[in-house]
Amino acid sequence: MNKKILSIILASAILCSSLVSCARSSGDGASDSTSKIEGGTTELGTQIEGAPLVSAAGAVDPTTIEFKGKDIYSDHSDGINISISDSADSRGAGYTVSGGKLTITSDGTYVISGKFSDGQIIVEAPKEADVRLVLAGVDIYCSYSAPILVKCADKVIVSLPEGSENSLEDKAESTLSDGTEITAALHSRESLSINGTGTLNIKAAKDGITSKDTLKITGGVINIEAKDDGIVGKDRVLIKDGKITVNAVGDGIKSTNSEDASLGYVYIEGGVFSITTDGDAIDAQTSMLISGGEFDIKTGGGSANVTSSGQMQGGGFFGRYPTGNQPTSSANTVSAKALKAGAYLDLTGGSFTIDSADDAIHTNDTVRINNGKYAISTGDDGVHADKKLEISGGAITIAKSYEGLEAQDIMISGGYMNITSSDDGINAAGGSDGNTGGDRMWQDRFNTTQNVSFVISGGEVYVNAQGDGIDSNGDLTISGGIVCVSGPTNSGNGYVDIGENGHGFYMNGGIYLGVGNSGMLVTPSTNSQQNSVTASVSGKAGSTLSVKGADGEELISFVVAKQYTTFTVSHPNIKIGDKITVYVDGEKQSEIECTSVSTGGSAGGMGGPGGMGAPGGMGGPGQKPSGVRPR
């Protein structure tokens, strides 16, 4: 049961040199995010003295993320007013305007307005300087470098006053005399903050905004068109608020530090985001935490740009691949995930609309979801974790996927999930991908001999799968919640599949209804703590299957997405000796007596067709199961 081959290209340039007068360590940069708040507060709590922002192998700790008072927009009435133009020639305290360049050489607040038809703003201040650039209506085009270039300072704040409209456009990358590559229209070698409520429009020949240290955004309307990446904070990206639109050939928002495991992460607590990319939408080299915000994301041309076998059809958002020419080597394969992290990916809030060619939510380690709303269409997996997937809350609707949820270890203790998949609905480290037409573009291959686990202890899970509904290469245990599965109509898969070599399907609590064909039937183990009944029943796609208990009360009702011939039901109120009654669209089909822990089952192993009836035809693609909660 080999799964998909992961093909990820990490293409990031690391600057190894800096100005001698502005040399700084990563430790200096880290202090920016952990300093005591000056003149402001945070909703995330008090700084813990000496606590790391991210452990070497851990998740982002929200209690250590803070925004200083100066990161938040404030009045600029005490600033130095500067008017720029191609012919301007002036000097003042801390600045010079000459030859189409504004050079800032001292700390302070500078209120800038005007236009350079081919020029730039340069910040080259002492390494301890805090420089605030208030863009009060600037229009800067630069053909030879970055329209705004921060060479040296301690920190630079770009403020966007209310009602201001500002534009930056560059034509090409450039290189400083020390070899430093300038890759963004707004490029900073130091910590950078952006705040305010005004507008900043960027048209970039490569990246839109780059900080080689920490990048913070607490406000502003930011619109970026980039030939490569939209927003890059090498050490970390911290976003509190703002309205951000990114259209990028590369990635949307990313943190890239791969040298220090405590850096390279993304934290977002609010804002409105519209991100369209050929690459990844939001990418953290290490970990990611999103606790709020509204996200509209499209990657790689969207899920429609991937065939059922997972191959790109070509003509992505920026036409990266010609039709029919899927890259076959990792060197040419582009990662087009919506949310991607190298370690932990924590989602504790927010609203997400995702249309991705690659995985919608992906990490090389652990995904944890405990809140938020997710509307997902993807050409690959809805949620993929190489190691652990933990879902304890939130509302997840996966309208289209290759596989809905996938990880080596899966733990579901809460939340609502409605999953539609062309292969397995939920897969714990295994299952056949049914891919006979060549490798899919993005494949995540699991070792089927690894120890895996799959436990559902709460929540509501509704699955409509063309492959296995729920597939575990180890044991499957349901001890709580509601689980309804519309399995495949073909005989090569089942509504449940478990691992070989003595693994079992254990019903220890909760409510379970599996519906499909009998070709690969797996029923709950006789070692289960809760009774189950398996029997034949025929119904067409879209019909309602309901089961009533011995007292005539309805135990479960489920609108089944595809034609079916077999069902398995388990409920705390089904006792040995009870008779359950089965209805299809309100018409009584049969009465079945529960005679054992697994009535009609096969001790949790693989069942044969054994008189269960022939499998039905294929249901329509893309139908979502709709579960009716037990009464």
Summary of predicted features, one role per range:
Residues 5-631:
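A composition-driven surface/loop motif
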Residues 1-2:
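N-terminal secretory signal peptides that target proteins for export/translocation
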